[in-house]
Amino acid sequence: MLEYNIVMRDTALRKLVPANAMRLYTNDTLTRMENFSPQLGSQTTIRHMVLNKSYLLLTVQDTVNFAIKTDLNKADTGQVISKYTYEKKWFKKKHLGMRCNRMMVDHPDFEEPIEFLYLKKHSRKYLNNFEGIPGLLVKYSVVTPDGVLNYELVQKRDYMPNRDLFGVPADYRKVTFDEFMDFMFPSSQSGPGQN
């Protein structure tokens, strides 16, 4: 289990955007990523790393539970060109008692290059976000429309979680993204499950 704290890089925005947390549970082929924010509440993604498919678990209006299916192989990612540039650095740094490799990462939205820390001997497949980093990220930053977010690992526990954690609960309705949008913004046609 990995637990990250998420805060805005810009200290002036930290009062407007409160700190969040992210937990990542994994076994050999599945990951469960749990996020919580005061604005959106709880968000959980269950991803099959081999099949590259996922479910996003959401609760709408505190009553209706949805599991939104996504086939990441078919997802319209387009030709996304990474704006991140990477430069390896010498020497290692300790974080939570672990020796981490260093990488200076730059992006047009960063005021200056930011140091990322990663564990080279641990796979990057669990987070699956920066292709230029050859290991599990421990400390990193992500550009969002609201600003730059800093992620920092605050806890790492090695254990095999209960496999029920990786299933979609029975009270969740499995839908595609289009079916979910039809439910949220109904038109004159019937919504999902009303045919």
Give the label of every model feature segment.
Residues 1-195:
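Extended soluble regions of mature proteins
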